[in-house]
Curated annotation (Swiss-Prot):
InterPro entries documented for this protein: ExoRNase_PH_dom1, ExoRNase_PH_dom2, ExoRNase_PH_dom2_sf, KH_dom, KH_dom_type_1, KH_dom_type_1_sf, NA-bd_OB-fold, PNPase
Reactions listed under catalytic activity: RNA(n+1) + phosphate = RNA(n) + a ribonucleoside 5'-diphosphate
Protein name: Polyribonucleotide nucleotidyltransferase
GO molecular function annotation: 3'-5'-RNA exonuclease activity; magnesium ion binding; polyribonucleotide nucleotidyltransferase activity; RNA binding
Region (Disordered): 702-723
SUPFAM superfamilies, alphabetized: Eukaryotic type KH-domain (KH-domain type I) (SSF54791), Nucleic acid-binding proteins (SSF50249), Ribonuclease PH domain 2-like (SSF55666), Ribosomal protein S5 domain 2-like (SSF54211)
Length: 723
């Protein structure tokens, strides 16, 4: 049946949100064009007709940026978009997290959700349009999606919450919180905050959820008019008789195995049980499909037992209490030649973070859809396979590494000093050396220690902790500092980072359909208790940032010049500034207001570069005496360089008190002579007199005023001095 174009509209934060269906991408299972202000995003949802032979739900979410959306042509030689930007990967994950839990257990059809950003209005966030568009595309399609969901951004300006803040409002906001959910519950939260108390965070989440509910009602109206009938699918379920047989065979052994406290030993014990059961069925010559079911049933039994222990017996696999943190240890200064390093260990999770300081010219240049063009604070996260005792390829960062790195960056950025306070580019790299859950939060703790070790004057130390949840019917248990098995088999991974004062970042992923206010509140307060305990431990390792930077870190010298002189310092095609850099070995960054940052490991090189720049911008003053160098001789006089690039003419009549027949009788090229500035004419030409210097010296009955040479300050007396 031919689809007709339909247009639906609702007001969101004072701006129209328009959904168009039935005109574009009609071969997808579902498609929606979202217009929010001048932001335009096309979201599509497509599914395979047959289930895939896999043991997981194959969902892919892609957020595609197009630089034409902001009137840009991509840089480089290729001139087209390549791999997704970091922002695109983060938004893809942002959309994935709230929609993934809303597909039925056992659904194995491949689903792909694509949001293509076609036009960007900076006051109307494209990620919000993409999140809503993805939900609409799934909801009106024939894909069995148990939504809809919706999401909004919540800011806080002057103590008041704001939905989808504009760029101007965001600059004043101490909170950037993305909340998504169904009409009944919240199922995704992601935030960056400037040390905001937990109570305020909770109210912001609930404030955002009220708008979410309104947007869901809007989507339900759309689905009622243009929604397709859902396709019939067969959900994967293992053979009940086989499950009963394996339960009888392995349940007791699994109960013992999951309570082995140490991770590697527990994993080995569970694998031994599984291997024994699989070997039995292999001996019976079971086919591949049956063996696959055996493995899935065994996994289900392990999951059930872990969850039963936690919710019923309040026992965790490693024997801890539900609110107990694993043993902590930390150290700083572990790498001798780096600018700062911190090692943080929590149980069998261990992260080494390294802080590197650079000049402002080392900032990361961004070429994306946002207004931001550069970034001076970076946190990168690496997760090598040896951290979990496995082999594997060492490739570039994947989506998970980029997501964890960004979360750590968001958590630490509020405490990083401003460019004026600390004019350095800061790069943190977190190397995961051991992993048993909560590595992203361990990287925040290790990075805090690394910055303090490097002497970065952070406003306050930051720690992070991951909270878990196991929910069975109406009973639930919240876990502090979850380990790998609790994350894998539980219902929630709620990461909370902050200072003693408040939250700086949080991220919530869940596997169930949503959480209530009560669960969120309990998780936030339990996380605060754990965070303060970790901060107490970190302060025992290093209580405050070091007063001195590492001797291997660059030293930065700041100077100010008249902005009108910037072009003189740079020179034609950068010739002058490159000459200074080549001569001194420093890095130089110049801002439009005339502030110059000179950086080098060698303080003497900084001072040398500063002197050269001062000479370049120095103004010649009438009446002043300078020590100059004869650069050129003509019949009518000598041209004398006073300092870098500044010269003047000593007429032959001004070379000496008596009559001078030839210029060469008094001076030669290369001589250094004292001259007085007598005039700067309308054309900027400088007239000099050596005779005036001699006369002044004779009038006061003294010798030639040699102290005037100090005005030059830096040129050695390599040539003879003429009286």
């Amino acid at each position: 049946m031919e689809q007709e174009k339909r247009v639906f509209s609702i007001d969101v934060a004072g701006r129209p949100l328009i959904i168009e269906t039935g005109e574009l991408a009609k071969q997808a299972n579902g498609a929606a064009l979202v217009r929010y202000g001048d932001t335009v995003v096309l979201s599509t949802a497509t599914a395979s007709r047959e289930a895939k032979n896999v043991d997981f739900f194959p969902l892919t979410v892609n957020y595609e940026e197009r630089l034409y959306a902001v009137g840009k042509i991509p840089g480089g030689f290729i001139k087209r978009e390549g791999r997704p930007s970091e922002k695109a990967i983060l938004v893809s994950r942002l959309i994935d997290r709230p929609i993934r839990p809303l597909f039925a257990e056992g659904f194995r059809n491949e689903v792909q959700v694509v949001s293509m950003v076609m036009s960007v209005d900076q006051d109307c966030a494209p990620e919000v349009a993409a999140l809503i568009g993805s939900s609409v595309a799934l909801t009106i399609s024939d894909i069995p999606f148990e939504g809809p969901i919706a999401g909004v951004i919540v800011g806080r300006v002057d103590g008041q919450f704001v939905i989808n803040p504009t760029v101007e409002q965001m600059e004043k906001s101490d909170l950037h919180l993305v909340v998504a959910g169904t009409k009944d519950a919240i199922n995704m939260v992601e935030a960056g905050a400037d040390e905001v108390p937990e109570e305020v965070i909770l109210e912001a989440i609930m404030f955002g959820h009220e708008e979410v509910k309104r947007l869901i009602a809007f989507q339900e109206e759309i689905a009622a008019q243009v929604g397709k009938e859902k396709m019939e699918v067969v959900l994967y379920e293992p053979d009940p008789a086989l499950e009963a047989e394996i339960r009888q065979l392995a349940e007791a052994d699994i109960k013992r195995a999951v309570q082995v406290p140490e991770k590697l030993a527990r994993d080995a014990a569970i694998e031994d049980v599984k291997a024994g059961v699989i070997a039995k069925y292999e001996a019976e010559e079971a086919d591949e499909e049956k063996l696959k079911q055996v493995q899935e049933i065994l996994h289900k039994l392990v999951k059930e037992e872990v969850r039963r222990l936690i919710t019923v017996e309040k026992i965790r696999p490693d024997g801890r209490k539900v609110d107990e943190i694993r043993p902590l240890s930390s150290a700083v200064g572990v790498l001798p030649r780096t600018h700062g390093s911190g090692l943080f260990t929590r149980g069998q999770t261990q992260v080494l973070s390294v802080c590197t300081l650079g000049a402002l010219g080392d900032v990361q240049i961004l070429d994306g859809l946002d207004l931001e063009e550069s970034k001076r604070f970076m946190h990168h996260y690496n997760f090598p396979p040896f951290s979990v005792g496995e082999t594997g390829p060492m490739r570039g960062p994947g989506r998970r590494e980029i997501g964890h790195g960004a979360l750590g960056e968001r958590a630490l950025e509020p405490v990083v000093p401003s460019e004026r306070e600390f004019p350095y580019t800061i790069r943190l790299v977190s190397e995961v050396l051991e992993s048993n859950g909560s590595t992203s939060q361990a990287s925040i703790c290790a990075s805090t220690l690394a910055m303090m070790d490097a002497g970065v004057p952070i406003k306050a130390p930051v720690a992070g902790i991951a909270m878990g949840l196991v929910k069975n019917d109406d009973h639930y248990t919240i876990l502090t500092d979850i380990q790998g098995i609790e994350d894998h088999l539980g219902d929630m991974d709620f990461k909370v980072a902050g200072t003693r004062k408040g939250v700086t970042a949080l991220q919530m992923d869940i596997k169930i359909k949503g959480l209530t206010r009560e669960i969120l509140e309990e998780a936030l307060m339990q996380a605060r208790k754990g965070r303060l305990e970790i901060l107490d431990h970190m302060m025992q390792t290093l209580s405050e940032p070091r007063k001195e930077l590492s001797k291997y870190a660059p030293k930065i010298l700041i100077m100010h010049i008249n902005p009108d002189k910037i072009r003189e310092v740079i020179g034609p095609s950068g010739k002058q500034i490159n000459k200074i850099i080549d001569e001194t070995g420093v890095k130089i960054d110049i801002e439009q207001d005339g502030t110059i940052f000179i950086s080098s490991v060698d303080e003497a090189a900084n001072q040398k570069a500063k002197q050269i720049i001062e000479d370049i911008v120095r103004e010649v003053e009438v009446g002043q005496v300078y020590l100059g160098k004869v650069k050129r001789i003509e019949k009518f006089g000598a041209f004398v360089e006073l300092f870098n690039g500044k010269d003047g003419l000593v007429h032959i009549s001004e070379l000496a008190e008596g009559r001078v027949g030839k210029v060469e009788d008094v001076v030669s090229i290369g001589d250094e002579i004292l001259v007085k500035v007598t005039e700067i004419d309308k054309q900027g030409r400088v007239n000099l007199s050596r005779k005036a210097v001699l006369r002044d010296a004779r009038n006061i009955g003294g010798e030639l005023p040699r102290e005037s040479r100090e005005k030059r300050g830096r040129r050695p007396e390599r040539h003879r001095m003429k009286p």
